[in-house]
Every structure is written in C-alpha cells, then in structure tokens.
C-alpha cells in the first residue's frame, strides 16, 4: 500500500491506535495512545483530504504509558488504560475534552473493551457535559492476570466492579 500520511506528534513509542465506531458521533476520528502519557485525537477526514495532520485534541492525565484506547457507546465516550493502574473515560463532546470517570486497579491495565449491550451509548445531555447512563459496562485486562467487568454508575462517579 501507499503511505498517505505520517503523524509525528508523539515523541515516544505509540502503543495503541484505534478508530471510532462507524455511523456514530465522532466516527471520523481516530485515537492514538503513547508512552508520552498522551492520547491524541485526529480528524480522519482532515488527514485524508490533506487539510491537516495535526491532532484536534491532546488528552492528558495518565501518569504512565497509555496502553489501550477504545471508543464506546455512541462514539462520544472513549476509554483509555494505562500503566499507572487507571482506566479513564473521556467525553469527546466537551470542550476541552474532559475525563468524566476514573477507576483505579492494583496493577497496570493492558486493555479495555465495552460490553456489546453498552454499545448503544444511551446518554442524557445536561449542558455541555454527557452523563453516561448507569449500567454501561466495560471490561479490563490487567497485569495480575485478571479480567474485571465494571458497570458505570454515571458521570463523575466510580464504576462498580461486578466481576
């Protein structure tokens, strides 16, 4: 294949790259997580049309390597995991993009996935913030060999561990 773009905003190794789900809010975006503790958000249409290869946002808050990023629900919320033992949920609909929930574990979190029943992305709009509906579930895979399932309790609160 022919290279059509080269994104150079991360100075350290990139560990995860993912696209938003198709046919949802922000489906024209991709997310890049790096050892520089940053997640960059890119507009795929701007890259494809050679308008801009610059990230539209840089999400900061993790204190270690970003190991995984996954879009869930209606595409407005993404989950990120890190070597700092924290999974974070981010609301792409806020400006600037806000971390709306954190969940800490005892070991680095290598991966995250949304439960298929949670992929509908039910939410309630309140001003500029999004409330994740209680009951949305995601799973994490950690350095201790455990897979944990969480159910969100809503924006700004910790998730309940259900497994």
Give the positions of each predicted feature.
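A structural motif specific to WD40 beta-propellers
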Residues: 2-5, 50, 54-57, 97-100, ...
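A conserved positional marker within WD40/Gbeta-like beta-propeller blades
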Residues: 3, 11, 38-40, 63, ...
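WD40/WD-repeat beta-propeller blade N-cap
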Residues: 8-14, 59-66, 102-109, 163
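WD40-repeat beta-propellers
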Residues: 17, 39-44, 87-92, 147-152
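Loop/turn segments within WD40 beta-propeller blades
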Residues: 18-28, 63, 70-76, 113-120, ...
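Conserved strand-to-loop turn within each blade of WD40 beta-propeller repeats
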Residues: 32-36, 80-84, 141-144
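Blade-level signature of beta-propeller repeat domains, shared across WD40, Kelch, NHL, RCC1
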Residues: 115, 134-162
């Amino acid at each position: 294949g022919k290279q059509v773009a080269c994104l150079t905003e991360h100075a350290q190794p990139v560990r995860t790259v993912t696209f938003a789900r198709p046919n949802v809010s922000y489906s024209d975006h991709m997310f890049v997580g790096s050892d520089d503790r940053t997640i960059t958000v890119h507009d795929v249409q701007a890259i494809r049309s050679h308008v801009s290869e610059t990230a539209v946002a840089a999400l900061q808050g993790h204190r270690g390597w970003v190991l995984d990023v996954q879009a869930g629900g209606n595409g407005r919320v993404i989950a990120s995991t890190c070597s700092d033992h924290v999974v974070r949920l981010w609301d792409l609909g806020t400006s600037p993009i806000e971390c709306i929930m954190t969940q800490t574990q005892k070991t680095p979190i290598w991966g995250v996935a949304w439960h298929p029943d949670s992929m509908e992305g039910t939410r309630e709009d309140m001003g500029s913030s999004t409330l994740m509906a209680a009951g949305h579930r995601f799973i994490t895979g950690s350095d201790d060999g455990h897979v944990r399932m969480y159910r969100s309790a809503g924006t700004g609160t910790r998730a309940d561990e259900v497994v």
